[in-house]
Amino acid sequence: MQVMNNETSHVIRFGDWSALSADAKAIRFEVFVAEQNVPAEIELDDMDAVCLHAVAYDGAGVPIGTGRLLPDGHIGRMAVRKTARGSGVGGALLQALMAQARARGDRRVVLSAQTHAAPFYQRHGFSIAGDEFYEAGIAHIDMQLTFA
């Protein structure tokens, strides 16, 4: 399945790990491992195999953003390449993953945001649902959104 966004001329493709792993992994390693110094050995986990993955592609077909939706309604591994930040790709990915969760019957979605990104998620309707904690040496905060 794919979603077109004409405003920013990108396409979002959904699939399982076998279909999207090469592109999702490339983005995640660029953002989390290379930029944020997350250890490579903890970036990939067993949950990738059971998630619905989303990858955004620019007009030339280059992968520029990714995220995943776990079976329990947790959105995670949201990452956008530096060159595409500020273009609306992150918001489009988030909204697309939320729509997938809602369509399958989830009543709410949750995520663990890097603290500096909390305002981004709040603009999309998420509220803070816990205290700050550290994961891979990076400050995070749990957030949630309940569908109306």
Language-model regions, residue ranges each:
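Short hydrophobic/aromatic beta-strand or adjacent loop that forms the aromatic wall/cage
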Residues: C51, I138-D142
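A structural microfeature
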Residues: I64-G65, G130
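Conserved acetyl-CoA binding element of GNAT-fold acetyltransferases
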Residues: T66, L70-T83
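Conserved acetyl-CoA pyrophosphate-binding loop and the N-cap/start of the following alpha-helix
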Residues: A84, G88-A96
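Conserved GNAT acetyl-CoA-binding A-motif
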Residues: A101-Q114
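Conserved active-site alpha-helix within GNAT-family acetyltransferase domains
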Residues: T115-A139
